[in-house]
């Protein structure tokens, strides 16, 4: 009964989503008119100086309530944080917030912000095969708990069945907030809703995002998965036998859809519950780490040995457009896979331009139809096929060219064409999107084509009085040799907050990804859909991290990150450098270390390890104040007493050098996780306009877990050698008879 009721609610919500209208619930409805000016604030306070930890949650709440105005009531407290921060979220008036700021114990107080979501075949594409390699060594992730912080989940999907799965590990402390005892199981072991609203509800999906990301990370094997008959095969996440814990932090039913206070609360509870991996496909943009809730929460998680994977954001191809930049986070960009859901635009002059679409109706005629680009007849709004823009334009029975952009969802553009009587749509890329095309479940026959194709199609329209076109459908095609390539939307580095740390760290599958969906888009059950974004690449890496954690339970979060980065692929299936959306070699700020190779990451040979305490000198070196560092690390820090280090001195599995006229000298320490007796020789790919000296040029290990340091001198050359280049890239690679350990280098010229 509960499942049927939820399906009905989701169908109604899907209709609302298609109209792009949400009706938010009022968080403060029950508090009365006198509290209309209350705002949620995030408050960081000094740790209570007592011997040992607080004895109970009640003691913590009592202490936090002591900061509140005497006239306020307990309903003002939104969350008390125990693990991720020394502080709480509370609803105050601006005057009360100003008064609280004056208290000596208060280190920081500011209004909370709203975070944004970063919205079958991939296991095979990544080399994961049943009974072999990493899937075999890790038992498909068995015993590892992945915490997914997202929009909730549709728990009844077959991707979350628990057939043959053991109970969760004894360390698991979480619980399930779904009503009915059979909703959670040995696969979906916990689910919480952290979004505070007038009516508290179970953590059901209402954004059509969290179900997909959870299934990508750890969905079970489901045969016969497809959407509109395309991408048919067996669906599976990266770690099919890992346990899932779901933390809902976003809801369409509240004003601030992904509130910061809920995200901190989810990370706080996940740490307490005992997760091994945290996956967050959301972000706030670039913020100082002491103001970034994910950076603060992730540091606390890292201290507990929890691996944190986050999406890089979808603001590419612009430089310095990243979210989630902290070095203790794995920052994941998006790449294509070798599967295309292919279609083409055929013009009256005989030319055909390849593209993609998910909706491929078999009854659509290949007969040529009149072709129109509405911008030539009206204005920019009609060129974008904005809602209502085609109302007074004759598009009935025609193929309509719609430009990408304008903040208008792809599906909404097609809906406008359909409502105006159009027969088909050609979705035309703008320059920034280049050759990146997406397969969407359009509402009418459509094809998404590249920027080069869009220019050619518009030139054809202008060349004749009677332009015609149609859309041809080719279905699923596997074997695109240009994969992986970097998606146009994938956010790029360098990091704004810490340019001395290379970001993103890695790229992974994030374009046209099939996974579980809450409501069927093609009237088939179980439901699947194909969507794109760094939101999709993040859970791929979260699942891969879970596999590595299962195969190597003694590895630290930093060691797992190092294994992923130093074994990454830098070539596509054709054996050429990975390309970007222009079909040009992608630079290091697009790819980071490269494209994830989970099979090689399982046996990296060497790793760069970092302990949580090592980040303190780095944070002081960023110029943060004692108070700001204390907010992040949750203990009193005086940078005067800490030997600060430059950003590039952190023992990171990459180098990011800000190079002026002086040489720079850095040390790295490698830990042997390969054969006890092994020798590595250095190979240097020297970046443009500089020299590199590495000493020693050969390193030998005689024990497992032995550590050996090496030293690197970065030597600038004359500025004229740089030409117009503002940065350069290269690599230091350690090679043995069994392993290749690549450390990428970015150089930003000052």
From Swiss-Prot:
Signals that turn on the gene: Rapidly induced in roots during development of arbuscular mycorrhiza (AM) upon colonization by AM fungus (e.g. Glomeromycota intraradices).
Glycan attachment points: 37, 136, 380, 462, 677, 724
Occurrences of domain PA (ranges): 370-456
Family, similarity comment: Belongs to the peptidase S8 family.
Gene Ontology terms: cellular component: apoplast; extracellular space
Residue stretches making up the Peptidase S8 domain: 125-602
InterPro entries: PA_domain, Peptidase_S8/S53_dom, Peptidase_S8/S53_dom_sf, Peptidase_S8_Asp-AS, Peptidase_S8_subtilisin-rel, Peptidases_S8_3, S8pro/Inhibitor_I9, S8pro/Inhibitor_I9_sf
Protein name per Swiss-Prot or TrEMBL: Subtilisin-like protease 1
Active site: 150, 209, 535
EC number: 3.4.21.-
Organism of this sequence: Lotus japonicus (Lotus corniculatus var. japonicus)
Any one biological process term the GO annotation gives: arbuscular mycorrhizal association
């Amino acid at each position: 009964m509960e499942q049927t009721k939820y399906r009905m609610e989701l169908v109604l919500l899907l209709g609302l989503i298609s109209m792009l209208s949400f009706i938010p619930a009022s968080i403060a409805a029950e508090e009365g008119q006198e509290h209309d000016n209350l705002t949620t604030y995030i408050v960081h306070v000094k740790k209570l100086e007592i011997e040992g930890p607080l004895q109970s949650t009640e003691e913590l709440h009592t202490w936090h309530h002591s900061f509140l105005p005497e006239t306020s009531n307990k309903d003002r407290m939104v969350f008390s944080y125990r693990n991720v921060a020394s502080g709480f979220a509370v609803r105050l008036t601006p005057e009360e917030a100003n008064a609280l700021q004056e208290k000596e114990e208060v280190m920081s107080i500011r209004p909370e912000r709203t975070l944004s979501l970063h919205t079958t075949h991939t296991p095979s594409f990544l080399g994961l095969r049943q009974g072999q390699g990493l899937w075999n060594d890790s038992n498909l992730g068995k015993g590892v708990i992945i915490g997914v912080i997202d929009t909730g989940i549709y728990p009844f999907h077959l991707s979350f069945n628990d057939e043959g799965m053991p109970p969760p590990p004894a360390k698991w402390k979480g619980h399930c907030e779904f009503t009915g005892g059979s909703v959670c199981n040995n696969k979906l072991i916990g689910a919480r809703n952290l979004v505070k609203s007038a009516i508290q509800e179970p953590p059901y999906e209402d954004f059509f995002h969290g179900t997909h990301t959870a299934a990508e990370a750890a969905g079970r094997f489901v045969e016969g998965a497809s959407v509109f008959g395309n991408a048919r095969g067996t669906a599976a996440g990266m770690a099919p036998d890992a346990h899932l814990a779901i933390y809902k932090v976003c809801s369409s039913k509240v004003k601030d859809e992904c509130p910061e206070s809920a995200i901190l609360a989810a990370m706080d509870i996940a740490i307490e519950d005992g997760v091994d991996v945290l996956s967050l496909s959301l972000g706030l943009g670039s913020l100082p780490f002491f103001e970034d809730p994910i950076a603060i929460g992730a540091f606390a998680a890292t201290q507990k040995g929890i691996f944190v994977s986050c999406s890089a954001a979808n603001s590419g191809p612009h430089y310095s457009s990243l979210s989630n930049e902290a070095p203790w986070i794995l920052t994941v960009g998006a790449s294509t896979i070798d599967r295309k859901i292919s279609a083409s635009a055929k013009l009256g002059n005989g030319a055909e331009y390849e593209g993609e679409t998910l909706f491929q109706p078999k009854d659509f005629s290949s007969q040529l139809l009149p072709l129109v680009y509405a911008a030539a007849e009206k204005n920019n709004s009609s060129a974008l096929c904005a809602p209502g823009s085609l109302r007074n334009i004759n598009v009935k029975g025609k193929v309509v060219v719609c430009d990408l952009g304008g903040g208008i969802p792809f599906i909404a553009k097609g809906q406008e064409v359909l409502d105006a009587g159009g027969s088909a749509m050609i979705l035309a890329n703008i320059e920034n999107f280049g050759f990146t095309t997406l397969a969407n479940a359009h509402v009418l026959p459509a094809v998404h084509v590249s920027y080069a194709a869009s220019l050619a199609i518009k030139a054809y329209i202008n060349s004749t009085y009677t332009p015609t076109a149609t859309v041809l459908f080719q279905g699923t095609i596997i074997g695109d040799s240009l994969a992986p390539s970097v998606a146009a939307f994938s956010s790029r580095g360098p990091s704004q907050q810490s340019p001395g740390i290379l970001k993103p760290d890695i790229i992974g599958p994030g374009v046209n990804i099939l996974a579980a969906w809450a409501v069927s888009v093609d009237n088939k059950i179980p439901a699947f859909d194909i969507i794109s974004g760094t939101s999709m690449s993040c859970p791929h890496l979260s699942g891969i991290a879970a596999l590595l954690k299962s195969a190597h339970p003694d590895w630290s979060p930093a060691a797992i990150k190092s294994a992923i980065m130093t074994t990454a692929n830098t070539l596509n299936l054709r054996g050429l450098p990975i390309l970007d959306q222009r079909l040009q070699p992608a630079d290091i700020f697009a790819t980071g270390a490269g494209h994830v190779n989970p099979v090689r990451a399982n046996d990296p040979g060497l790793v760069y390890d970092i302990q949580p305490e090592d980040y303190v000198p780095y944070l002081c070196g960023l110029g943060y104040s004692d108070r700001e560092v204390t907010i992040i690390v949750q203990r009193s820090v005086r940078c005067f007493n800490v030997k600060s280090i430059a950003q590039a001195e952190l023992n990171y599995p990459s180098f990011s050098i800000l190079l002026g006229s002086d040489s720079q000298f850095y040390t790295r320490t490698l830990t042997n996780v390969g054969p006890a007796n092994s020798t590595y020789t250095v190979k240097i790919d020297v970046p443009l306009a500089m020299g590199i000296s590495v000493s020693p040029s050969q390193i030998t290990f005689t024990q497992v877990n032995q550590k050996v340091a090496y030293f690197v001198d970065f030597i600038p050359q004359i500025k004229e050698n740089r030409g117009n280049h503002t940065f350069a890239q290269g690599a230091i690679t350690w090679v043995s008879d069994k392993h290749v350990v690549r450390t990428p280098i970015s150089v930003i010229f000052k």
